[in-house]
Design a protein with these regions (language model features):
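Hydrophobic alpha-helical connector segments
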Residues: 56, 70-98, 152-156
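Amphipathic alpha-helical packing segments from all-alpha helical-bundle domains
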Residues: 63-70, 104, 114-140, 150-154
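Short helix-capping/turn signature of helix-turn-helix
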Residues: 47, 106-112
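Hydrophobic/aromatic residues within well-ordered alpha-helical segments
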Residues: 50, 57, 61, 65, ...
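C-terminal peripheral helix-coil segments that are non-catalytic and often amphipathic
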Residues: 85, 89-96, 129-140, 159, ...
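Helix-turn-helix
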Residues: 10, 14, 18-52, 56
Length: 192
């Protein structure tokens, strides 16, 4: 028998799958209830509103970022090595592990309102600040040239996170090759 936490996780996984495929506005609570094999009333027993469900999915996605991207690199003292490991972990997360949740964070962030939006934005800001600090440390050590740390952080994120739009696991590059290639372009540039 499932615990209530396991049941909620199962509901959120089904909801994430549907929202990933149909978008938040295109997914009804009835769709989610049907996918979970329950009534809509039963679904509302676990989740109060559709926005609360979206918020829970986004929190789960941010938990994954913190656990799989930032967690393993936070104790790497060398800032350039930390940035390169962050890039590899982020590419892995986007391409292999949790594409649905990451896509939902990227596509549906403007759907949230009020406190829910502020909660997710605060968590996203922590990641940006982590990157900014890492770029600033790498500049201070002379590992990279002087650039605007905020511009570097958002360029990093744009480059890495956009891969979910075009990368295909059955394509020419493995996730590791993709991370190496993006890292080479990002940290070494295009010039010979």
């Amino acid at each position: 028998m499932r615990t209530s936490g396991e049941k909620l996780r199962s509901i959120l996984q089904q909801a994430a799958r549907l929202i990933y495929l149909k978008g938040f506005d295109g997914t009804s609570m009835q769709d989610i209830a049907d996918a979970c094999g329950m009534t809509k009333a039963g679904l509302y027993h676990h989740i109060a509103t559709k926005e609360a469900m979206l918020l829970a999915i986004m929190h789960y996605g941010m938990d994954l970022f913190e656990e799989r991207v930032m967690g393993p690199v936070k104790d790497i003292a060398d800032p350039l090595a930390r940035l390169k490991a962050t890039l590899a972990n982020n590419v892995r997360l986007v391409t292999l592990d949790s594409t649905k949740e990451v896509t939902i964070i990227l596509h549906e962030h403007s759907t949230l309102t009020g406190d829910a939006k502020a909660e997710i934005n605060a968590r996203k800001k922590q990641y940006v600040q982590f990157l900014e600090r890492s770029f600033e440390e790498a500049m201070a050590k002379g590992q990279i040239r002087k650039v605007d740390a905020t511009l570097a952080a958002f360029s990093f994120l744009g480059t890495v996170l956009w891969t979910y739009k075009w990368y295909r696991s059955d394509g020419a590059l493995s996730p590791e090759q993709l991370a190496d290639g993006i890292g080479d372009l990002f940290f070494n540039g295009l010039m010979p």
